[in-house]
């Protein structure tokens, strides 16, 4: 399996997971929106009765407050959804080294490192990954608690950081931004 195929498989799997998470988040957001609308309806009926008693000025003030409160409820729930699904995505990424695909991912990371920095670059992987790689030109050190590759050009001037921890941050940031935009639509 070529590096491009593995990367496409990883990207496809990632996109499928993102879609599943986004679909679940959209359903949850629709439910929240319905609850918000129901709450607004109830609040509006209460406030209409008060308006008759206290006048239109008070009514407008209360409705504005209810809308702000309802928006805050939705914002808080959306944040909870982002946190919840972000945590799930984070766990999937952190546990990549425990999957059967990790061997191929690790080999492709090494290939990418050598292609980018030259065949004589210094490639480091976790000591725990020693049994996964048969290449004798690899240094084994504890570089990252979640796995990956840290490569340096032979002269030490260029470093390619493919450690899971580094990649994870970027993926999660993009995931949360995309999920938030899907929820807002």
From Swiss-Prot:
Q: Which domain of life is it from?
A: Archaea
Q: Does the keyword RNA-binding apply?
A: no
**Where does the record say this protein resides?**
Cell membrane
Q: How does it sit in the membrane?
A: Peripheral membrane protein
Query: Quick one: where is this thing mainly located?
Result: membrane
Question: Would the keyword Cell membrane turn up in this protein's UniProt record?
Answer: yes
* Role: Component of the A-type ATP synthase that produces ATP from ADP in the presence of a proton gradient across the membrane.
Family, per the entry? Belongs to the V-ATPase E subunit family.
How is the subunit organization of this protein annotated in UniProt? Has multiple subunits with at least A(3), B(3), C, D, E, F, H, I and proteolipid K(x).
Protein name listed in UniProt: A-type ATP synthase subunit E
Q: Which organism is it from?
A: Thermoplasma acidophilum (strain ATCC 25905 / DSM 1728 / JCM 9062 / NBRC 15155 / AMRC-C165)
Per the record, the gene is atpE
């Amino acid at each position: 399996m070529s590096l491009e195929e593995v990367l496409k498989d990883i990207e496809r799997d990632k996109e499928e997971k993102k879609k599943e998470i986004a679909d679940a988040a959209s359903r949850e957001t629709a439910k929240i929106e319905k609850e918000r609308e129901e709450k607004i309806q109830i609040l509006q009926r209460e406030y209409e009765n008060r308006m008759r008693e206290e006048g239109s000025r008070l009514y407008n003030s209360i409705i504005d407050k209810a809308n702000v409160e309802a928006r805050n409820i939705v914002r808080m729930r959306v944040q909870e959804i982002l946190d919840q699904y972000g945590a799930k995505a984070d766990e999937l990424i952190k546990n990549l080294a425990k999957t059967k695909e990790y061997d191929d991912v690790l080999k492709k990371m090494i290939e990418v490192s050598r292609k980018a920095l030259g065949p004589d670059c210094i490639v480091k992987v976790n000591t725990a990954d020693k049994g996964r790689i048969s290449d004798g030109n690899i240094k084994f050190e504890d570089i990252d608690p979640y796995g990956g590759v840290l490569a340096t050009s032979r002269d030490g001037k260029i470093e390619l950081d493919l450690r899971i921890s580094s990649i994870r941050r970027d993926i999660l940031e993009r995931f949360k931004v995309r999920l938030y935009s899907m929820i807002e639509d």
